Amino acid sequence: RRYTLSLHDALPISVTDIDGNFVLKLTSSKATLEFKYLGYQDKTMKVTQKGNVDLGTIALSLDAKTLGDVVITSSIAVARKTPVAVTTLAPEFIEEKLGTQEFPEILKSTPGVYATKQGGAYGDSKINMRGFKSENIAVMVNGIPMNDMEWGGLYWSNWAGLSDVTRSMQTQRGLGASKVSAPSVGGSINIVTRTIDQKKGGSISYAMGNDGYNKLLFHVSTGMSKDGWALTLLGGKTWGDGYIQGTEFSAYNYFVNIAKRINDAHQISFTAFGSPQWHNQRSNKDGLSIKGWQAVKNYMGDKSPYRYNPTYGFGPNGERMSASHNEYHKPQLSLNHQWQINEKSSLSTAAYVSIGRGYGNAGQGYKKDANGTTYRNMWYGSYKGNLNTYFRNSDGTFAYDQIYDMNEASDNGSMMAMSKSINEHNWYGLLSTYTTKFGDYIDFYGGIDFRY
């Protein structure tokens, strides 16, 4: 292995050959040498002899902080070395800048990335990368693809709690070599979570923000024991009223990682995380024209008219309602194994399962005619940028009680209806990648990506 060698507290002055051999001329009989190698702890050695000195074999200890299994499995690109347009966000940056924003919004300052909250509800953010929608962006957590196997995209509300367990987040913009069969024409996003690298300790925190935003979080980690075991636990709850009118939300998130460093060549880890949540929404189909937004100023008082939700109202029992509503829970469990075969070759394998259960509601509008069974494309809140005023109270809220009364009085079934789209799926996958080096400039990758 090539080590970096320097005088203590000085710039590097020598690099060893591939076998670790080096010759160094010193101007003083006393010196402190410092040895560095990626993935190992730095080591210092004092030299006080004159003449030629053979230091023998110098052994470096593994450093769990920089040689985590998920980093190798996820294939993080190296700045100024990997030939791709890449941006890496450290956990300190995420913690400092994220605040009460949605997780994808942390990428707003990344070149070529456009992030928006869409309707403005919890977890409804979306990302475009170099003009491509999420269906053409590969999103991975610890190297495991998260994109839906049918339509290619993903819903960030299912992973809203990832911001609390992210060790680093990296975006690669544009086409590039990929180890997974996920759509990545626009680029890829790789999220690496906490693992064996965590220091021993824990914390409890509470945060609050505008519009009833609350977040309670706890985290504890054992650090790596002398036997090579490490355990990290995290749990939390986020709830609030939402910035947009009628977008209340409540979400839990949990994370568990159990890791074992068997020896210098083998390491295994088990990871489980999820974020069960529900949130009311403002449909992106309820957007108004500029004239329409100005017309709702009277409904919002001193608040911005753009916070108005055309389908916000109250049910027959006084409960808050919105035509669009989402509830979902999609936990993921994975078992990772990292095998460092030799100095040039490695094999990383991940087996995973993800189980999704939930649904979403949406308003479907009027029937076509008295004898029809289908509903025309007229949404509850608005139609073609114009606010629906047929079922509107004087304060601007949507009159759900009038719809209940109308449907109850109808002799031909419900005149206005809401649909519930149910999504239940079980994902199973196996991802294995073999890597080896041929000389200093050629890397070979091969493997399998199985998903069912």
Locate the predicted segments by residue.
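Short, acidic, small-residue-rich periplasmic hinge/interaction motif at the N-terminus
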Residues: 7-8, 34-41, 50-96, 134
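Transmembrane beta-barrel wall of Gram-negative outer-membrane proteins
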Residues: 201, 208-239, 244-282, 333-337, ...
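Short, small-residue-biased leader/transition segments that mark boundaries at the very start
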Residues: 3-11
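Acidic/polar loop-and-plug regions of large Gram-negative outer-membrane beta-barrel proteins
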Residues: 259, 267-334, 361-419
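Short acidic/polar hinge/loop motifs at secondary-structure boundaries
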Residues: 23-25, 126, 145-173, 192
